[in-house]
């Protein structure tokens, strides 16, 4: 008589257990030992019971474990321009790199970018709350109340650390495309690209914009983390003209220079720049290393706006039709 079938050998189904997310599943990808399920609103990590208990010693384990990773789904620009864009571009059919490793690093980079945005939002909320409180309070004597956004040094340090972690992951991805970059920095990448492709190459033009900010991130982090001179962070401060200045940061260290700037603006601008940089480097590095595909004239191009919501990305492999419209393939 045949042995009874183990419960884990049977088919089944499950629903995402998040009452705050009733949106449909839009994407699924297998990465490492996990399945990632992405709805319009959130991203989840799923693993099977055999991954938790491979020897099947506990028959009472539920067949599936699910965990919400982010409140970032296919409606999120952060996720679309990082993880979704990497999924479309970092493909074995088109590239000779370690695509699985590139995807793992992209996910790790997204974790840092999501945390960085939380720091941005937290600081912006603290700053605005302090401003609102000041505007709502009337002066009772001849003194002037100066608001506070909290420990601005700590906020800036946390932001710089998360930003630098993201930049480090991005450099690891770069080294999958350019093995000779191992142990080298952004200046080295820029010099290599100019020597190989020429100053006017679009990839070099992207690096001309990106590298100064990537170095600013590292230098700001070094100063704040190691208490080095070169970064000045100020909370709300009274000015000689009687006004109250908002929290600011200025940088002058190792060639990186930033004039006194509102901290909330600095954070939002750097966060946007990092997202732009990831997307553009992914596009240009993939284009530079694209392999021939079945004898067809494939290239990377902009996904038409009317189908971007279906693709969840702005760039893809494809071809131009006779009318000059880019047709994404894959």
Sequence positions of predicted segments:
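Acidic, Ser/Thr/Gly/Pro-rich intrinsically disordered interaction regions
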Residues: 1-114, 140-154, 172-330
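Generic structural signal for bulky hydrophobic/aromatic residues embedded
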Residues: 119, 162, 169, 224-227
